């Protein structure tokens, strides 16, 4: 059984191939036109072969049975005789719109043009297939549309802006067919026409561009009056409404469910002229006002409108006299609701119906310029809307602000003049004979200093302080630090008085001083601008400077005394050219000339300051803490006492006196310092003379050995019982080859047997002991390299006096002895040698072991012996 063929698909392809061919089309349905209008019938061809540009033939038949040639695009003699005249006049013509499309135009259609129109195309195809013609029916109706204005000729309306107006258009039709009318109002102004409002054939309203808002607000309306009148109503006329108004009416008919316009007529209804609203403004031409006063400008309005219009008034300010608003500043605005919008210090008021006043308070020079008044008139519209009916700008009003500067004089005097250094100085700068200094003017001061010169050289003034208009005080470089420290005080005592006070006047402050009083004027933004400066005459601050003189005389009231007695010394002070002096006293002591124990050494013992506060300075004798007293006998006399004097107290004693001068409050300034004549304490005695020396059996030791040093005290002169002698012994070392370093305390032993050891940074230790009455042994155990150097001892002898008190003698020092610490070479190299030999032996044995193992196991090869063949020699005689 065979496979069936796909018959449906094959039949479809076959029918598509057969049906495909040329297609000629004209609009489907019936085309309706009115007598006198233009008829346009389009025709196009598709799916054809041959050239791209196709030709068309048009034929007409009134009944649809026999067609008469009407027009052709390619054959001149194609039209019938009755149509050739209309073709020549252009009433009938063909207009090609594309290579495959053409339009038939028949102007001024007549009833005889009603019938059937056929469009055909000559064949250019290889095979004839498809349709080559298409036909449509045209109906021609009589003109039954009547359009006209409500009155003839068209009226001319003259209106004012804001007034209402109405226009009417009559339109009707008596067509036997069911037709609809569409109406459109247009405004023509020269070559430009605008659509205002239209009523479509479907009964819908369409406002034109720019009229949407007015239509929705009800300002522009379109309604019918009766059966044939259409009324355009404008509630408020605008200047843009001026022009010629036309009523355009079109008639529509429905054919096979679609609407088509069959004719359109237009008629001139009216010409509307909008008269502009007269608006004039009057402002003063020029105004002069004093700075600080109020500026009052009026803007008077004149208009021919008597209806309900509301003005909007705006004032502008600018620096140039033109009327352009460029680079202008708006000052105030009164809107149509009578709400005022203004900048600070500006007010806008409504005086009467047609007068508006601008008030600028507290004017300044910045207000000089030109003022413009801009007025706009607003008329109410439909549905609470407003529209502008007029606007005008006034001529510029020139305003000049004059300044009447304040008048005053400045007088400077010195209320306090210094007689000495550190005395206060006070200057007062007063403002007198003031005129025109009101609340809008502030007076501030600046202080200046100028150094006096003996010659005629000009010296620049130095600013001390300046006060700005906001009362801010700024210091100059000369006075900044001293003002911050409170030495310079600038103040305003009264409204007209400024003061400058120097708490402590120095010689550098001598010179000329003057003040400058500045007038500041307040601006509208609450800022202050300087307007005037007035200088005072200078005041010279000077006093004759003489050197301060301070003389101190010391005396010893009691005669010569012995050790253990009380020493007393008084110091009398006298001064000149020092203001209200107070004295501080320092007692000093120096060793007498020839004392080698501590030459040129000055020791401070006790002091008393200018407030009578006593202080022990370098008095270190703990056993005699209360042994010295310094007291004030009179304002210029002081007494020093030292109880239980020692032989070691011998020396030259002086009073060092410093004079202090008050500089204000509790502060004092050092005025002068002087040293009194010396008072000597010299104990004439035949007592023993002590000497000290250092001895060592070994001056060179090996590191680690014991260093033994003896401090030996010898006594010359009087023989003393050992129980009447005691010694303070201290050992010092200078660890250098010379004595160029500071000595280091090793150990000390006081007369009571208490040992004190100094701090050291290495391991060796020291010990100090008394070997005999006059010998003291210092031992350095386990000496180090750092222990080399110069060693010496310091001895302070103590001797018991016949009264039983101990007297300290002068401290004595031994000559230094140099100790050398050597290094033990054998001990130093013993351990490194043993370690080196041991390491070498171990490394050698290890190398031998490695070599043996390598040769025995790793590098051994089997050697084969080569055998040689031994053959016996045969006798040559053998056969």
Curated annotation (Swiss-Prot):
Span of domain Ig-like C2-type: 22-129, 149-268, 276-389, 406-527, 544-662, 688-813
Motif Endoplasmic reticulum retention signal per record, residues: 424-427
Subcellular location: Endoplasmic reticulum membrane; Golgi apparatus, trans-Golgi network membrane
Segments carrying motif Cell attachment site: 89-91, 703-705
Post-translational modification Phosphothreonine, affected residues: 271
Spans through the membrane: 833-853
Tissue specificity field: Reproductive tissues, lung and heart.
Organism domain of life: Eukaryota
Annotated signal peptide: 1-21
A biological process from GO: negative regulation of translation
Record topological domains on the Extracellular side: 22-832
Membrane-topology annotation of the record: Single-pass type I membrane protein
Cytoplasmic face residues: 854-879
Stored InterPro entries: Ig-like_dom (IPR007110), Ig-like_dom_sf (IPR036179), Ig-like_fold (IPR013783), Ig_sub (IPR003599), Ig_V-set (IPR013106), IgSF_V-set/TM_domain (IPR051102)
Pfam families: V-set (PF07686)
Keywords tagged on the record: Disulfide bond, Endoplasmic reticulum, Glycoprotein, Golgi apparatus, Immunoglobulin domain, Membrane, Phosphoprotein, Repeat, Signal, Transmembrane, Transmembrane helix
One GO CC term, this protein: membrane
Disulfide linkage: 43-119, 169-247, 299-373, 429-515, 571-655, 711-793
SUBUNIT field: Interacts with CD9 and CD81. Part of a complex composed of CD9, CD81 and IGSF8. Also seems to interact with CD63, CD82 and CD151.
Protein's job: Inhibits the binding of prostaglandin F2-alpha (PGF2-alpha) to its specific FP receptor, by decreasing the receptor number rather than the affinity constant. Functional coupling with the prostaglandin F2-alpha receptor seems to occur. In myoblasts, associates with tetraspanins CD9 and CD81 to prevent myotube fusion during muscle regeneration.
Name this protein carries in UniProt: Prostaglandin F2 receptor negative regulator
Gene designation: Ptgfrn
């Amino acid at each position: 059984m065979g496979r069936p063929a796909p018959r449906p698909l094959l039949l479809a392809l076959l029918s598509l191939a057969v049906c495909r061919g040329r297609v000629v089309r004209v609009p489907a349905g019936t085309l309706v036109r009115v007598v006198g209008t233009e008829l346009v019938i389009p025709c196009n061809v598709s799916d054809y072969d041959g050239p791209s540009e196709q030709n068309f033939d048009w034929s007409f038949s009134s009944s649809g049975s026999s067609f008469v040639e009407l027009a052709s695009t390619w054959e001149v003699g194609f039209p019938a005789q009755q149509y050739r005249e209309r073709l020549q006049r252009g009433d009938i013509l063909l207009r090609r719109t594309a290579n495959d499309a053409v339009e038939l135009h028949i102007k001024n259609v007549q009833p005889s043009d009603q019938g059937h129109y056929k469009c055909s195309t000559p064949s250019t195809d290889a095979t004839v297939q498809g349709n080559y013609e298409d036909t449509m029916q045209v109906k021609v109706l009589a003109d039954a549309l009547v359009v006209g204005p409500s009155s003839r000729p068209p009226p001319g309306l003259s209106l004012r802006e804001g007034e209402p107006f109405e226009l009417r258009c009559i339109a009707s039709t008596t067509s036997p067919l069911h037709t609809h009318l569409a109406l459109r109002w247009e405004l023509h102004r020269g070559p430009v026409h605008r659509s205002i409002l239209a009523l479509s054939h479907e009964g819908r309203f369409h406002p034109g561009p720019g009229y949407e808002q007015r239509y929705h607000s009800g300002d522009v309306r379109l309604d019918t009056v009766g059966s044939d009148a259409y009324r355009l109503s404008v509630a408020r006329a605008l200047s843009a409404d001026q022009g010629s108004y036309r009523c355009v009416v079109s008639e529509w008919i429905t054919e096979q469910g679609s609407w088509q316009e069959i004719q359109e007529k237009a008629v001139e209804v009216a010409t509307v002229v909008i008269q502009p609203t007269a608006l004039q403004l009057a402002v003063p031409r020029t105004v002069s006002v004093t700075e600080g006063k109020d500026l009052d400008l009026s803007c008077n309005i004149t208009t021919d409108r008597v209806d309900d219009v509301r003005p909007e008034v705006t004032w502008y300010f600018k620096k140039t006299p033109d009327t352009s608003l460029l680079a202008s500043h708006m000052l105030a605005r009164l809107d149509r609701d009578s709400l005022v919008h203004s900048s600070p210090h500006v007010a806008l008021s409504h005086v009467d119906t047609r007068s508006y006043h601008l008030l600028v308070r507290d004017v300044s020079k910045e207000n000089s310029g030109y003022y413009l008044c801009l007025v706009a008139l607003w008329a109410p519209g439909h549905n609470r809307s407003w529209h502008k009916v007029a606007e005008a700008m006034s001529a510029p009003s020139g305003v000049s602000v004059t300044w009447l500067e304040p008048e005053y004089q400045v007088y400077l005097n010195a209320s306090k003049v210094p007689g000495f250094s550190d005395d206060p100085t006070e200057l007062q700068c007063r403002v007198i004979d003031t005129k025109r200094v009101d609340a809008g003017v502030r007076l501030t001061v600046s202080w200046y200093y100028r150094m006096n010169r003996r010659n005629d050289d000009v010296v620049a003034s130095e600013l001390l302080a300046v006060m700005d208009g906001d009362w801010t005080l700024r210091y100059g470089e000369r006075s900044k630090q001293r003002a911050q420290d409170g030495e310079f005080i600038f103040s305003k005592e009264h409204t007209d008085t400024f003061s400058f006070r120097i708490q402590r006047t120095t010689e550098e402050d001598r010179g000329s001083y003057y003040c400058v009083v500045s007038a500041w004027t307040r601006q509208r933004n609450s800022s202050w601008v300087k307007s005037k400066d007035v200088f005072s005459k200078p005041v010279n601050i000077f006093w004759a400077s003489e050197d301060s003189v301070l003389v101190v005389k010391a005396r010893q009231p009691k005669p010569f005394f012995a050790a253990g007695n009380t020493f007393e010394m008084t110091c009398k002070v006298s001064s000149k050219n020092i203001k209200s002096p107070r004295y501080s006293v320092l007692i000093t002591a120096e060793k007498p000339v020839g004392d080698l124990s501590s030459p040129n050494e000055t020791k401070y013992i006790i002091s008393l300051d200018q407030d009578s506060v006593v202080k022990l300075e370098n008095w270190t004798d703990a056993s005699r803490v209360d042994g010295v007293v310094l007291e004030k006998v009179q304002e210029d006399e002081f007494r020093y006492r030292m109880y239980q004097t020692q032989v070691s107290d011998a020396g030259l004693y002086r009073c060092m006196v410093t004079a202090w001068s008050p500089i204000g409050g509790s502060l004092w300034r050092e005025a002068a310092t002087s040293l009194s004549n010396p008072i000597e304490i010299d104990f004439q005695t035949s007592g023993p003379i002590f000497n000290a020396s250092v001895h060592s059996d070994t001056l060179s030791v090996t590191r680690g050995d014991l260093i033994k040093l003896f401090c030996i005290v010898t006594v010359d002169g009087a023989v003393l019982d050992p129980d009447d002698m005691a010694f303070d012994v201290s050992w010092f070392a200078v660890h250098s080859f010379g004595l160029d370093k500071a000595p280091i305390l090793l150990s000390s032993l006081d007369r009571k047997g208490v040992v004190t050891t100094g701090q050291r940074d290495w391991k060796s230790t020291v010990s100090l002991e008394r070997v005999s009455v006059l010998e003291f042994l210092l031992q350095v155990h386990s000496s180090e390299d750092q222990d080399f150097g110069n060693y010496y001892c310091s001895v302070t002898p103590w001797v018991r006096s016949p009264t039983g008190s101990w007297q300290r003698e002068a401290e004595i020092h031994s000559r230094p002895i140099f100790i050398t610490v050597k290094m033990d070479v054998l001990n130093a190299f013993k351990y490194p040698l043993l370690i080196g030999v041991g390491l070498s032996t171990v490394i050698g044995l290890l190398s031998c072991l490695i070599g043996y193992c390598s040769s025995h196991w790793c590098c051994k090869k089997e050697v084969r012996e080569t055998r040689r063949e031994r053959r016996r020699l045969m006798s040559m005689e053998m056969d």
